[in-house]
């Protein structure tokens, strides 16, 4: 159990599957945004990061609807606000250079709907098409954990962490999994090596609870951080890269 984390984290600290058939898709986008469109798209993405999803969607309506970037952000917004049109938007992107993002979005939709088997298929395909995308690997780990595959989830969290050196999301997910497994020594080693703070530890504790277990008492220092009180549903969403606020 300790070997994987020891080997996997070594490179990160020193330097900082089944697929769906026939959906390789083009690897590059030929469309390019003009300067004004790029500025508007950046504004839309800022609104999304701020949680102003309806405002972002309204701004997208003033842009050419056929642009792939517009279609991708529209699908993301519709998914986040729970609009059923999101599925069709993602499916329409499967044969474009946005196929990795489309499979990722479809996987998160499946996970939200409780279809963890389909979620794993879609997220595996997203990771196959873009294997170095940290958020795809992280979210695949969450889906695998929902399927009860802790070994697979651990592998994906470590991969995501090494791809995004210093990334708090895969780090806290991995720590949460270690708490879930009762791996106190590995958990403490991870905290020390990555210099995780009390807020990170509380987030990991909350995720471990939402994933089905309470962390071993004494495995982490106490804190008054409000993340410790987040409900299970909120923690499942914040464990996924594209769901974090």
Swiss-Prot record:
Lipid bilayer topology:
Lipid-anchor
- Keywords tagged on the record: Cell membrane, Lipoprotein, Membrane, Palmitate, Repeat, Signal, TPR repeat
Give the InterPro entries listed for this entry.
TPR-like_helical_dom_sf, TPR_rpt, UCP029658_TPR
Q: Where is the signal peptide?
A: 1-16
Q: Where is the lipid attached (N-palmitoyl cysteine)?
A: 17
- Region annotation (Disordered) ranges: 210-245
Lipidated positions (S-diacylglycerol cysteine) are 17
> Which Gene3D superfamilies does the record cross-reference, listed alphabetically?
Tetratricopeptide repeat domain (1.25.40.10)
Q: What's the main place this protein lives?
A: membrane
Write down what this protein is called. TPR repeat-containing protein PA4299
């Amino acid at each position: 159990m300790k070997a994987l984390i020891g080997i996997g984290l070594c490179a990160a600290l020193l330097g900082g599957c089944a697929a769906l058939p026939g959906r390789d898709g083009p690897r590059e986008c030929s469309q390019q945004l003009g300067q004004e469109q790029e500025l508007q798209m950046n504004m839309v993405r800022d609104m999304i990061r701020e949680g102003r999803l309806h405002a972002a969607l309204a701004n997208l309506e003033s842009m050419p609807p056929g642009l792939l970037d517009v279609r991708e952000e529209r699908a993301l917004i519709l998914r986040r606000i729970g609009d059923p049109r999101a599925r069709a938007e993602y499916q329409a992107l499967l044969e474009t250079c946005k196929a990795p993002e489309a499979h990722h979005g479809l996987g998160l939709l499946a996970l939200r709907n409780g279809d963890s088997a389909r979620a794993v298929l879609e997220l595996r395909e997203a990771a196959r098409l873009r294997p170095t995308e940290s958020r795809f690997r992280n979210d695949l780990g969450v889906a695998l954990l929902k399927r009860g595959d802790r070994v697979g989830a651990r592998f994906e969290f470590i991969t995501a962490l090494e791809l995004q050196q210093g990334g708090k999301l895969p780090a806290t997910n991995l720590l949460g999994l270690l708490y879930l497994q009762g791996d106190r020594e590995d958990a403490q080693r991870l905290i020390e090596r990555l210099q995780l703070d009390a807020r990170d530890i509380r987030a990991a504790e909350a995720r471990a609870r939402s994933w089905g277990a309470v962390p071993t008492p004494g495995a982490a220092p106490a804190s008054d951080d409000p993340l410790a009180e987040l409900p299970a549903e909120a923690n499942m969403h914040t464990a996924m890269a594209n769901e974090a606020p």
